[in-house]
Amino acid sequence: MQKLIVKGKKKLSGTIKISGSKNATLPILAATLLIDKNITLKNIPFVQDVFTMINLLKFIGVNIQVFKKKNILKVSNNKKLKTVAPYNLLKTMRAGILVLGPLLARYRKAKVSLPGGCAIGTRPVNLHLFALEKLGAK
């Protein structure tokens, strides 16, 4: 293993702000489907996939308030939600499949189109389907 040794007479100190992660935000947003209370999410990176997931959740019936300048989302889904996620909302994002599990858990049924997204290698959804089958989904 290589090392990086820093020698100096000045002590390093300070703080930096770490931006939020898209790959953490998308599953957290999908998981909000399981909760029927108000949720505040902070340090949200407002990138295209996050906006696509917001639009998908809004279509399903989730109330989402976006506070872009503060990187905050306020999520509320205390009403009956749709159990369908159409292709036109999933075609540009792989993470759309993540709403399938929470919708199945909450409503015992869901119809989610296969996701689109970029073609970086193979990223099949069969593992999601296999896991849901093992949990009793048909």
Please name every model-derived segment.
Residues 1-138:
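Structural preference for solvent-exposed beta-strand-turn elements
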